[in-house]
């Protein structure tokens, strides 16, 4: 899966979770999306894991600073 395909799929997941049209970039953070709170974060992580058929470790989840870092982990594990 290419990085472009990862971001396209991530944008779909984000749009579903936050119920709005969202296009994520390397630098997108929780501060950029109004409804991204701790509960939404849990849902988002679960949906991303399902979409990419991967499981993040707790260390990975806590270490993600932006969507680019999430994509790095997906790319490494996909």
What are these regions, as identified by a protein language model?
Residues 2-36, 40-46, 50-78:
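Phosphopantetheine-dependent thiolation modules in NRPS/PKS and related acyl-activating systems
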């Amino acid at each position: 899966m290419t990085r472009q395909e990862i971001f396209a799929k991530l944008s779909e997941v984000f749009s579903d979770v936050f119920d709005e049209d969202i296009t994520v970039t390397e630098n997108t953070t929780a501060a950029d999306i109004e409804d991204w709170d701790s509960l939404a974060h849990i849902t988002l992580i679960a949906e991303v894991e399902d979409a990419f058929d991967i499981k993040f470790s707790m260390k990975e989840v806590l270490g993600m600073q932006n969507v680019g870092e999430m994509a790095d982990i997906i790319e490494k594990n996909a």
